[in-house]
């Protein structure tokens, strides 16, 4: 069915409350979009971060009387009369099919493929991880996830243990297990991430070799041959004392979620305990790897 879209512009600190107003006016969904197409990066836990100049977009049923909606919004104290807005009719599409068509199998390194479940596996003899795109967690499309997957593909993981610190969808831990790791441990602060990792591990037949913990419940004195943390530069610096003790002597460390401009600051937090490799970059993002001294 066709839809009607109403777009308003506001500041980032007012966007969420304005979105609530659109829901009150009958919007079936509300999304936020940067007016200037600048990226917004994942906030720290408990923090909501939006752009300074934000478009708030409400989606309405095609039968909605938008004149009534506008009149209601003009009476709202946060908006008022004469507010600037844009209304347009969206063509009727099979949105689910169009969304699915955007995702294809992706290759990382020499052996590893990440494949949506509705696509044919390009190479049945390769290492294939079946993973469907979701709303919150990594699927390989982001440069930082790609950098980590390429790195894992380059390692000899046979018989090794891996810790995925900030596991999200579990994509890195699952890929490591499919690449030969004997055991993987996923840690995250978000219960939804733990559930997503569990579901994806089950789908890929590796759930018996994957242990999952909320960060507050992780066992003391964990260690592994390989540790990967694809989170953000701030947490990587703050958590360096905790992350640095996880790899065994001679073990591998891989860090990402870091902008290239932040690499030096993150590397400095780890250089005392690791022999660091040259930084690898993809687009504006980077990966820092090293060996535990």
From Swiss-Prot:
S-adenosyl-L-methionine binds at residues 145, 166, 188, 230. It comes from Yersinia pestis. SUPFAM superfamilies: S-adenosyl-L-methionine-dependent methyltransferases. It is an enzyme of class 2 (transferase). Methylates ribosomal protein L11. Its EC number is 2.1.1.-. InterPro entries: Ribosomal_L11_MeTrfase_PrmA, Ribosomal_PrmA_MeTrfase, SAM-dependent_MTases_sf. One of its GO terms (biological process) is methylation. This is Ribosomal protein L11 methyltransferase. GO terms for cellular component: cytosol. It comes from the Bacteria.
